């Protein structure tokens, strides 16, 4: 299943390990390190980064959507998969 992370950008749900807030120092360091390694994907379309998605391939994806918004989308996908809708 795929999750829309904003502006038409999608990520495979099975590859997501975590969705975190970008404000803490460790997350800023993680973002900088990913940039140096060539593992940073900026999907913000020039807007403020509101969440960081960490994948199992060690990629860091920046999104302009709030963590809560992405979580709602993931939960909706899970409900559809479970047949609750």
Curated annotation (Swiss-Prot):
The name this protein goes by in its record: Putative regulatory protein THEYE_A0405
Species per Swiss-Prot/TrEMBL record: Thermodesulfovibrio yellowstonii (strain ATCC 51303 / DSM 11347 / YP87)
Similarity comment: family membership: Belongs to the RemA family.
Pfam families: RemA-like
InterPro entries the record matches: RemA-like
The organism's place on the tree of life at top rank: Bacteria
């Amino acid at each position: 299943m795929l999750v829309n992370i904003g502006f038409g950008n999608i990520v495979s749900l099975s590859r997501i390990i975590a969705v975190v807030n970008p404000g803490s120092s460790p997350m800023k360091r993680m973002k900088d390190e990913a940039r140096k390694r060539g593992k940073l994907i900026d999907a913000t379309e020039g807007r403020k980064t509101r969440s960081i998605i960490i994948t199992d391939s060690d990629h860091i994806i920046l999104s302009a959507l709030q963590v809560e918004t992405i979580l709602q989308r993931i939960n909706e996908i899970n409900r559809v998969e479970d047949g609750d809708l």
